[in-house]
A protein has these predicted regions:
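Conserved active-site regions of diverse hydrolases
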Residues: 2-377
Length: 377
């Protein structure tokens, strides 16, 4: 019995020690990274959007962040892509929709609501809970082709330029599954989308590699069952649907887990086919789960399942009074929250995640390792 008690006691202590060590390593590894990249190009959805949605929609966005337009973000501050740019000594990425901008140091093609699959897929499958405009992955790649013409003039020059650029391709897929859930698809039916979504992502990465890209970061999905909008829209009276430790909805996280597992397998295969490149899988899921399990250890005193900015309710998310709309309020301590508006994150977790992608352990391999190995070669 005594041995059993020691084991039970040691598990949370060990977890706490691991978190403390990780935080110390991240804070201690603040030396500047090599100024290796000449540009960064980002694709994805609202977790990376730095203004495209605002520009496309004539500046009409309920949740207006604290950045001046056209660099509006769905957060109270910087995103992962911003911290990556800063780490490599590059300016924050301008949105590609801001025509006339100099994109010689990078561009951001990400748009809130973007999907991995084209609009036609959803219409063909009677999924109509989608944005009225098409900003899918393939559309963003078309925008990249347009921007490319302003950066370089011939294929050889372009390949040389992109070989020294960093590409961040995603997160994609979260919106695809979200729209299917809204169409009342079953768990089993939503999971049937995953192979198509992953195959689309791999084709997109291959297209960038064919353009000359050598370093591509591909983020996985976040745990949708931890996000306040999911917890609010799909409550269950069956307590077994919830994780007893954290309170997240297990079925929605299971789709993200399946997506991420299939994506990693597909990226490993792609890496073997394209040994001249480094394809990095970047993990959103694991750090978010850690925030949900032990938020206080990361400084999130208000937890991971309740939004900072919202219109009330158990998770401070209300569709009729979402962040920025009448009836919503904003907390005084955003850094004590993981969730900003019930969908997106506050700046603090984005900073933490970016550091783990740069230094490890939540990127495979870490970007700092990729750069230093490439410089040696």
């Amino acid at each position: 019995m005594a041995a059993s008690r020691r084991r039970v006691f040691s598990l949370p202590v060990a977890a706490a020690c691991l978190v403390v060590v990780l935080l110390r390593c991240l804070s201690a590894s603040g030396e500047p990274l090599p100024q290796y990249y000449n540009a960064i190009f980002s694709f994805g959805d609202s977790f990376s959007d730095t203004g495209n949605f605002v520009i496309i929609n004539s500046g009409k966005l309920p949740n207006m962040p604290k950045f001046p337009p056209p660099y509006a973000r769905c957060s109270n501050g910087r995103l992962v892509i911003d911290f990556l740019a800063e780490a490599f000594g590059l300016p924050l990425l301008p949105p590609s929709a801001n025509k006339g901008t100099n994109f010689s140091q990078g561009a951001n093609f990400a748009v809130m609501g973007a999907t991995a699959l084209d609009l036609k897929y959803f219409k063909d499958n009677n999924v109509w809970s989608i944005p009225p405009f098409n900003t899918s992955m393939n559309v963003q790649l078309q925008w990249f082709d347009e921007v490319k013409q302003t950066i370089c003039s011939d294929p050889a020059e372009c390949r040389a330029f992109f070989s020294k650029s960093l590409f961040v391709f995603g997160e994609f897929g979260g919106n695809d599954y979200s729209f299917a859930w809204k169409a009342e698809w079953s768990l089993e039916k939503v999971k049937t989308m995953v192979p198509a979504v992953v195959a689309s992502l791999v084709r997109g990465v291959e297209r960038l590699l064919d353009e000359g890209a050598r370093h591509v970061v591909v983020p996985g999905n976040l745990p949708a069952g931890c996000i306040p909008i999911t917890l609010t829209m799909y409550p269950s009276e069956d307590r077994s649907e919830y994780d007893p430790r954290t309170g997240y909805l297990k079925r929605y996280n299971s789709v993200a887990l399946y997506h991420n597992a299939m994506l990693r397998i597909a990226l490993d295969r792609l890496q073997r086919r394209r040994p001249e490149a480094r394809v990095v899988y970047a993990d959103y899921y694991t750090p978010y789960i850690q925030f949900a399990r032990t938020p206080h250890l990361y400084g999130y005193k208000r937890g991971a399942l309740r939004a900072c900015c919202g219109g009330g309710g158990p998770y401070n998310y209300n569709m009729s009074a979402s962040c920025g709309l009448p009836g919503s309020t904003t907390c005084e301590d955003p850094d004590a929250h993981v969730s900003w508006d019930g969908i997106h994150l506050t700046e603090a977790p984005y900073r933490f995640i970016a550091n783990t992608w740069l230094k490890g352990p939540y990127a495979h391999p870490p970007l700092a390792t990729v750069v230093r190995e490439d410089m040696v070669d």
